[in-house]
Amino acid sequence: MASSQVGDMVNGNAEPTRHLAKFPPSLWGDRFTSFTLDKQLWDKYGNEIEVLKEQVRSMVVAGGRKAAEQINLINVLQRLGVSYHFEKEIEEQLEQLFAKFEDNEDYDLFTIALHFRIFRQHGYKMSCDVFNKFRDSNGEFKETMSNDVQGMLSLYEATYLKIRGEGFLDEAHAFTIAQLESLVEGPHLSSDLSEQVMHALKQSIHRGFPRLEAKHFISFYEKDASRNETLLRLAKLDFNQLQLSHREELCHIFRWWKELDLISKVPYARDRAVECFFWSTCAYYEPQHSVGRAVLTKIMLLLSVTDDTYDAYGTYNELKIYTNAVQRWDVSAMDELPDYMKALYRALLNVYDEVERDLAKQGRAYGVHHSKEAFKEIVRSYEIEAEWFKEGYVASFEEYMKNALVTSTGRLHTTSCFMGLEADVATTEAFEWILTKPKMVAASGAIGRLVDDVMSHDEEQERGHVATGLDCYMKQHGVSKQEAIVELYKMIENAWRDINEEMLKPTAISMKLLIRVLNLSRISDVVYKYVDGYTHPEIIKDHVISLFEDPIPM
């Protein structure tokens, strides 16, 4: 979020006042500068993976399995992180399973909730009426549920797929959290099950970073007496092989960023190359999207430095000049800029030129124009916030959110993310869809903006910052900070409901595109869960190491 300095001079002196943020430095030094891919190991993994994939594909399409067994197999494949190898087969199976599903089957809570979650994740609108049999005549949850730990855990995870108007799932969410927390504190759960429950309470499946959650689940699954060794072996090999690829990509990005040497010219900015790549890997981790990860990371880095320029260094007059330069998007505009801004502006133009050249080779350059326009729009909104800060203006919450849905980067990140997808998926129509300001992109932006406003509020206000959504809501409604936080989290939950609903069939665009918007939303849940983990990267350091450095023991 942007803010600017009160004025360009103090007491007539030429040196402007700058409310420096003093962001924490990069954690990584030269840790990711060099990496040599062990091609022999990579090929070894790959050869075994191909054999195992065919065995698992045969499992998925084999007939004769009961519906509950089939849905559980699909769930395990998803949670192990290997379902992307079998998307077509899984979708065909789910279409048949949903068409034949009968809620009068004698399914237990675990199985019903599992069906509900898997169907909803794939766009099938199963009614929450399927849970009615677990309520008594007074509408209360049956007491027997409290003793069914796996059922409670399954229902808890299912509640994250709720849409607006599903009050039952709100009640079920609160009920299962209370029961599971009580069980964890008691003596009756095994250590393995207790660990699984504690992790779920900390991070739900639906809102988690898919690759990190896969690694967690592998550690649980290998202790499961009913595990399938073929599935487990495939999951471990797949994670480790993909980790090698991601590590090599990160090394290229890290070296590119070091060679660009932008941070030495704008030392006030956050140096977050590794964290931006982590972010991009959440958007799409699959091996075929290596170009997309590089593109998205580079654009995120440029936006991060731009944000910090408006937020923690530039004077109002400097920022107005920079905003105009970005709108022109022409190298001649550089002559009007202060020296430190010239470096940033040059990097912006050069990186987009580089991205356009790379994508043109694959016939996908048409998305670059949309990304540029989204970048220009964000900068204009940053300037609006800079003006608000200069004037000491506290907007109404509605006025604030209208601007904040731009600065939340929803449109830019979605557009830039789409640029990395296959041309037959990210079509010109897909980019035009973004221009319609779809509910899902707005909801994703609202989640990121509001959770960031809550988590970074105290630190930003301490150094001097434009009024955030929290401040605007407190002033407009005359409520305390804590009361405003409660209301903002209600809005965040409603935004998640909107995302879930937009992913139900029939969808406006391909599910392959919508899943990227969902993944961008998931980042906010992971990175900003307890504090601003982007500004304070030590919060997500273990996630980065787990994803890019620590392989799974074979």
From Swiss-Prot:
Keyword list (alphabetical) reads: Lyase, Magnesium, Metal-binding
Q: What is its EC number?
A: 4.2.3.204
Quote the record's binding site residues for Mg(2+) 3. Answer: 452, 456, 460
**Function field:** Terpene synthase that catalyzes the biosynthesis of the terpene valerianol, which is a volatile compound of floral scent.
Note the InterPro entries from the entry. Answer: Isoprenoid_synthase_dom_sf, Terpene_cyclase-like_1_C, Terpene_cyclase_plant_C1, Terpene_synth_N, Terpene_synth_N_sf, Terpene_synthase-like, Terpene_synthase_metal-bd, Terpenoid_cyclase/PrenylTrfase
**Looking at its record, which EC class is this enzyme?**
lyase
Protein name as annotated: Valerianol synthase TPS1B
Cofactor(s) recorded in Swiss-Prot or TrEMBL:
Mg(2+)
Give the record's family classification.
Belongs to the terpene synthase family.
Source organism of the structure: Camellia hiemalis
